[in-house]
């Protein structure tokens, strides 16, 4: 094998001068050098260079050969097994289709209790009407805030109210006595504040 020779400049003559810009252009292109009648493409390399051996040792060849053979055998053994699995005879296929047809559940007549699983009508939940004794459609409820009625008498007074008129406006029961609201609402309104400290200079 011919030895590789690295030249510092593109032109192998030691006396030639090359500008810095030309050196960058020349380094990007490989140089062709004729050695012993064989043309070789040479590129500039830095550092130590080692020649690769022409051939691998026999021991490594044997090791790689056995590994390659083992993988080829495993591939070959796996291939036929996959091909053998889907091959079935026509009789076996017909028997399987008959079995699958027989395993299909019977018609709905055999299970009438499935229809009675829901004992109620689902459409009952779609109606939002109140019972007849609790109808509030005739009441003027436009702009009515949340009411808290303690007694049934106040509820009857509310039912006796007529349509609202600007001339005669009765005082609604939910606005008259605000202090008579339940104590639970008042307890939610109580907030404990920290003690006042007068020592701080402003």
From Swiss-Prot:
Annotated signal sequence is: none
Q: In which tissues is it expressed?
A: Expressed at low levels in the pituitary, liver, spleen, prostate, testis, ovary, small intestine and colon. Also expressed in various pituitary, testicular, liver and ovarian tumors.
Q: Which InterPro entries match?
A: Securin_separation_inhibitor (IPR006940)
Q: Which residue intervals make up region (Disordered)?
A: 60-105
Q: Which GO terms describe its cellular component?
A: cytoplasm; nucleus
Which Gene Ontology terms cover its molecular function? Answer: SH3 domain binding
- Span(s) of short sequence motif D-box: 61-64
Q: Motif (SH3-binding) spans which residues?
A: 163-173
Any one Gene Ontology BP term:
homologous chromosome segregation
Query: Looking at the Swiss-Prot or TrEMBL record, what is one Pfam family this protein matches?
Result: Securin
Where is it located?
A: Cytoplasm; Nucleus
Q: Which UniProt keywords apply?
A: Cytoplasm, Nucleus, Proto-oncogene, SH3-binding
Family according to the record? Belongs to the securin family.
Q: What is known of its domains?
A: The N-terminal destruction box (D-box) acts as a recognition signal for degradation via the ubiquitin-proteasome pathway.
UniProt protein name: Securin-2
Q: Which organism is it from?
A: Homo sapiens (Human)
Q: Which gene encodes it?
A: PTTG2
């Amino acid at each position: 094998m011919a030895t590789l020779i690295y030249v510092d400049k593109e032109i192998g003559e030691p006396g030639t001068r090359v500008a810095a810009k030309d050196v960058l252009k020349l380094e990007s292109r490989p140089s062709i050098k004729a050695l012993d009648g064989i043309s070789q493409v040479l590129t500039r390399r830095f550092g130590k260079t080692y020649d690769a051996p022409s051939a691998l040792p026999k021991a490594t060849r044997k090791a790689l050969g056995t590994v390659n053979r083992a993988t080829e055998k495993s591939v070959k053994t796996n291939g036929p097994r996959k091909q053998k699995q889907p091959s079935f005879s026509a009789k076996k296929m017909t028997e399987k289709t008959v079995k699958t047809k027989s395993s299909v559940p019977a018609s709905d007549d055999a299970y009438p209790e499935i229809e009675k699983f829901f004992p109620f009508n689902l459409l009952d939940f779609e109606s939002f009407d109140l019972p007849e004794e609790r109808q509030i459609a005739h009441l003027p409820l436009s702009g009515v805030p949340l009411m808290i009625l303690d007694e049934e008498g106040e509820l009857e007074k509310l039912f006796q109210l007529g349509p609202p008129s600007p001339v005669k406006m009765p005082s609604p029961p939910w606005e008259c006595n605000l202090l008579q609201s339940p104590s639970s609402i008042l307890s939610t309104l109580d907030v404990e504040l920290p003690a006042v400290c007068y020592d701080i200079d402003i």
